[in-house]
C-alpha cells in the first residue's frame, strides 16, 4: 500500500534521514520506533509532503507521490495526525471536524455519523471549544478530524503521548476497528512499547538516521530494545 524507497533528507548540512526504505502493507498497523531525535517525525513529514526528500521516493498503491504537495497527497488518501495534536482551540469540536472535510472538496459538507460512533465523547462535546477538552479528548478529536477526510493510509505521530491509560485503550480499539472494518493502513510513530506490542503488526526500528531492524512486533526482543530504545 505505502512504500518509502531509498529516502534521504537533510536540514541544510545536517543529515537527518539516510537511505530509508520501508513497506507498509495494506490493512496492517506498522510502527516506527526509535529514540528521540532519530528522524521519525521528519520521516512522517516527508511521507505527507510537508517536507521534500533530498533523494528517494514515496509510493502509495504504486502511484509516485514524491512530487505532490501535502494537499494533493491528502486528496490521494493520506491522512496525518501530528505530534502534539494541533487542534484549533478556538473552534468548537464540530468546527474542528469540518476542517477535515476540506480534503473531500465538494463531495461532502456533513460530518459522517461514523465519526461520532468511533468517538462518542465528541458528539457529547460537539459545541465545546477544542481548547476546553482534556489532552485525551483533544487526541481523539485530532484522529477524528483526520478520519473525516476518508484516508486510505493514516499516519500518527506518537498518539499516546501524554494520554491517560483509559484513553490509550480507547484509541487502540478505534485503530484496530479501522483496520478490521475498513482495511485501513496505519503507520504509527510510537514510544510506548506495550501499545506497540498490543496493536501493532510490524515494526521498523530507526537509529542514527537509518533503519536498523524490522519485522513482526512479536519479534521485538530485549536485545533490540536495549541497544536501540533504552535511554
Task: Please give the residue ranges for each predicted region.
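Helical segment within the ABC ATPase nucleotide-binding domain
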Residues: 169-182
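Helix-to-loop junction immediately C-terminal to a conserved catalytic motif
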Residues: 48
